[in-house]
Amino acid sequence: MNILRLDASMRKTGSYSRILTDKLIEQLTSGKNNEVTIRDLADGIPLIDENWIKANFTDVDERTCEQKVCLVASDILVDELYKAEHIVIGLPIYNFGVPAAFKAWIDQVVRSKLTFRYGDNGPVGLVENKKAYIIIASGGTKLGTEIDFISDYLRHILGFIGITDVTFIDSSGLGRDESQTLAHAHKAIERV
């Protein structure tokens, strides 16, 4: 099984999303022959800019060498996504949203004619037959509440590119009851 692991926490140590992602990866790979690609978003993801936009919307056969170079990082990230059967995302909530590095990753992989296309009835996701696990960690923002702006966004953007089998592992609200929240998350991981 090929697994793509995305770590979105900017904290390299002491991060609950990273700790729980370690546990989930261990659960998924136990006793199996697996390849895990680790993409640590804290190491940096290029932001898209005007040159990237121009290159992306230029037909592949018409791209200049500079435009091809501009898209190299994006092409690598898209390739990692396509190779994976499972995508495991460790995601903290920062200021009621996803970390900037995760949004940068989304911008790099959501590409017309590559990960989605427009059909007669609207957009069609091209990244099919994938399973996504998303570990959400937060101090106070609880999933499923009126201030949860993340879960619907993630379901939508992943579904937009074709990833519709999404499981959330909830470790939100750690600031309220850390031990109970972590126990819940560990049980959810064991059920995977």
Swiss-Prot record:
Its EC number is 1.6.5.-, 1.7.1.17. The keyword Hydrolase does not apply. FMN binds at residues 9, 15-17. GO terms for molecular function: electron transfer activity; FMN binding; oxidoreductase activity, acting on NAD(P)H as acceptor; oxidoreductase activity, acting on NAD(P)H, quinone or similar compound as acceptor. Binds 1 FMN per subunit. Coiled coil: none annotated. Its cofactor is FMN. It catalyses: 2 a quinone + NADH + H(+) = 2 a 1,4-benzosemiquinone + NAD(+); N,N-dimethyl-1,4-phenylenediamine + anthranilate + 2 NAD(+) = 2-(4-dimethylaminophenyl)diazenylbenzoate + 2 NADH + 2 H(+). It comes from the Bacteria. PANTHER family: FMN-DEPENDENT NADH-AZOREDUCTASE 1, FMN-DEPENDENT NADH:QUINONE OXIDOREDUCTASE. Homodimer. This is FMN-dependent NADH:quinone oxidoreductase 1. It comes from Colwellia psychrerythraea (strain 34H / ATCC BAA-681). The gene is azoR1.
